[in-house]
Amino acid sequence: MPKFIEPSIEEIKAEKLYSDMGLTDAEYDKVVDILGREPNFTEVGIFSVMWSEHCSYKHSKPFLKQFPTTSEHVLMGPGEGAGVVDIGDDQAVVFKVESHNHPSAIEPYQGAATGVGGIIRDIVSIGARPINLLNSLRFGELDEIQNRTLTRGVVAGIGGYGNCIGIPTTAGEIEFDERYDGNPLVNAMCVGIIDHDMIQKGTAKGVGNSVIYVGLKTGRDGIHGATFASEELSEESESKRPSVQIGDPFVGKKLMEATLEAITFPELVGIQDMGAAGLTSSSSEMAAKGGSGMHMRLDQVPVREEGISPYEMMLSETQERMLLVVEKGTEQKFLDLFDKHELDSAVIGEVTDTNRFVLTYEDEVYADIPVEPLADEAPVYILEGEEKAHNTSKNDYSNVDVNDVFKKLLAHPTIASKRYLYEQYDQQVGANTVVKPGLQASVVRVEGTNKAIASTIDGEARYVYNQPYEGGKMVVAEAYRNLIAVGATPLAMTDCLNYGSPEKKEIYQQLIDSTKGMAEACEVLKTPVVSGNVSLYNETKGTSIFPTPVVGMVGLIEDIDYLNDFHPHAGDKLYLVGETRNDFGGSQLEKLLYGKVNHESEALDLSEEVEKGEQIKKAIRDGKASHVQTVGKGGLLITLARFSAFYGLGVDAKLDVTDAQLFSESQGRYIVAVKEGQTLDIPNAQEIGTVKDNGQFKVTNGQTTVEENVSTLNEIWEGAIPQCMTSAD
C-alpha cells in the first residue's frame, strides 16, 4: 500500500489536474519532453510553482533585461536574494523590495506580516544585519468598509512583525484609489549592512556537502502560494486562505540571530531563504547556481504533523525557514548552533554531481528532475501589446476655486498625514534612526561610523496609466529627488512591478513602455537595478489595478553632521527650484474636478534632474539649506501646506503662477528653506517667501490668497485619516 494517496499519472493527464496547478497544456507537454516521460503528482507540483509567474517572470523577463544592473558600487546584482552595493570602508548596503499583494487581499494581517518576514530573511540570507524597513501600500478609497478593514489589517501586520523582530520601520508611502478596491498592494522593503568578507550566496556546490534545514517545522500552510500569487483575484480567492502563510516573528528573530552567527563559520558553503515555493525553489535554485545536483531525503524534514506528503512538503510556504549547504563533516557544528537558538534543524540531503534534483521518502523516489530546465528554462512569453487611445480632449482649469480645492485635497487620504497609521510602527528600535517617518526619505546611521544610509520607497500609478513611458521615468526620478532632499548620493535601486494581467494587450503595452522609461531613468541618474520583484495579475472581478511600478532606492551620506541642524527655522527664506507648468494630466486636481485621470503631462527632462539634484545636494552639504521638500502630489500649494502643518511653522509666500498652477504637478521641483543670511546659488531659483513663527499660513499669487491658521491646517491634514478610519463600520 502506498504511503501517500495521490492522483496517478494517468489521472493527472486525463483530468488535466496540471491545469488546476497553473500549467498550460503546452507547458505540461514541455515538462514531458524534459523528463522523457509523464510527470508524477509531486513533479507536476514542483514545475507548476517554479514556472509560475511569481517565480519565473515568464511574462516580464524580456523587460527586466533592459535595466542597467552594474556600476562601480555594485558588488552583487539580480539573481541572488538581494542586491549588494559598496559604501566604502569594506562595508556594503544590502536591500530588496518584495510584494505580498494577493495574500494581503485574503488575510491582511498575516499577508502583510509574512511579507515583512520574507523580505527580512532575504537580507539576512546574504549575511547582512537589517537596519530598517520601508513599505509602499495601495488601498481602495476609505469610504468603503472593505478597504478600511484591509488597511487596518495590513498596517497592523507590518507593525506586528517588524516591532517584534526589532527592526524599525522608518519610511514608506500610502495611497488610496478605487482602482485598488479588493486588491491592495503591499510592497515591503528591507535594508541591511554587511562587511564585504561576510557576503553569502545561495549556491550548492561541493559533491557530498550536506544540506541543512533550519526553522519552523513544515506544515500545510502556504501550499501553492506562488501559484496563487500568479492568478487574478476572484470570488473563489477567499477559499484559498490556506495559501496564505502564517508568520512567527519571535521564531523569525531567533532565526535571524542564528543565521548571522552561522555566516561566520568558514564551513558554510551557501544559504537561501525558503520563500515563494518554499523548499522547492530554495533547493533547486541553489543547485542550479552551483552547477550541481541535489538529493533530498524528505523523511528527514522536520514536520508539524504526521502524514505530510512529499508534494505538500515541497510546496509548503511555512515561514521562518532557511536552507544551508555546509561542508561534509561539519554538520554537527551547525546543528549545535541552531539548537542553542532553540530552532528545529536537520540534515536532509547532500550535493551531488548528477545535475539532477532527486527527492526520496524512505528510499522511494518522488521526483527525479534535471536541475537546469526546472530552475532556469521556464517558458518565456512575448505577447502583443496595444497602446491606450490618447485623449485629445481638453479639460478646463480656468475657474478653479482655489480655497475649496485646497481644503479638499489637503484632506484626501493620499495627501493627508499618515501618522495615524505609521505610529503603529516602531521607528526607533536599534537607536540608529536619524530621520523619523514623515519626510521624503529615512536616514539610518551605520553603527560605529559617521556615515548613514538614506532610503526611500516610491510608487507611481496614474501617470504610468496615462503615459507609461514618461510615468516609468517619473517613478525613478521621484525616488532620486527624495534622496537628494536629505543630502544623500543615490547609489542604486530595487523595483517591484505591480500590474494587471499581461494577457490583456493594453496592460502588456504598459509593461513594455513603463519599464523602458524606468531603464532610461536608471541610466541617466546612475541608479542601477540590483534586485526586484514582479507582481502581475493584480485584478479583481475583471478590473485591473493601475499599473504601479514601485522603486526602492538607497543613497549614501558620508558624514551626517549636517543633519544635526537640518530642519527649518523661523526667518528662513523659501525658494522654489524648478519650473511650474500646466501639468494637470494625471494630477490630484484632474481627479478631483473631473472624476478620472485620462490626460497626459509634459515629458520629464532627466538631464535637468541630475543638474538640479547636484545643486540641491551641494546647498545642503554646504550648510545653506535647512530643509528641502520635493513638490509632489497636489502641487506647490499643497506642498507648502504640508510643510507648515508638519513643522508647526508659518509660511508667507508669493507665487508667480495661475490659480490652477497652484495645484500643477510639474516634475523636478523642490522647495528649499535657506538659513537666514544665506543665499541659494542655483540658476533660476525663485525666492518665494519666508518661514514664520506667527502661526499663520499665507500664500498668494496676486490674484487669489489662501490664508489659514497653522493649527487649522494641522487639524485638516492630521485629522483626515483618523476620521475616515474611525467611521462607523
Swiss-Prot record:
Amino-acid positions noted as binding Mg(2+) 2 in the UniProt annotation, renumbered to this chain: D122, D273
Binding site for substrate: S99, H100, N101, H102, R121, Q245, E317, T318, Q319, S535
Active-site residue list: H54, H100
Transport as UniProt keyword: no
Annotated Gene Ontology cellular component terms: cytoplasm
Keyword Nucleotidyltransferase: no
Superkingdom classification of source: Bacteria
Binding-site positions, Mg(2+) 1: E98, N533
Pathway note: Purine metabolism; IMP biosynthesis via de novo pathway; 5-amino-1-(5-phospho-D-ribosyl)imidazole from N(2)-formyl-N(1)-(5-phospho-D-ribosyl)glycinamide: step 1/2
Chief location category: cytoplasm
Binding site residues for ATP: Y57, K96, D495, G532
Example of a GO biological process term: 'de novo' IMP biosynthetic process
Catalysis: reaction(s): N(2)-formyl-N(1)-(5-phospho-beta-D-ribosyl)glycinamide + L-glutamine + ATP + H2O = 2-formamido-N(1)-(5-O-phospho-beta-D-ribosyl)acetamidine + L-glutamate + ADP + phosphate + H(+)
Keywords: ATP-binding, Cytoplasm, Ligase, Magnesium, Metal-binding, Nucleotide-binding, Purine biosynthesis
Assigned EC number: 6.3.5.3
UniProt subcellular location: Cytoplasm
Subunit structure: Monomer. Part of the FGAM synthase complex composed of 1 PurL, 1 PurQ and 2 PurS subunits.
Family note: Belongs to the FGAMS family.
Protein name in the entry: Phosphoribosylformylglycinamidine synthase subunit PurL
High-level lineage: Bacteria, Bacillati, Bacillota, Bacilli, Bacillales
Gene transcribed to yield this protein: purL
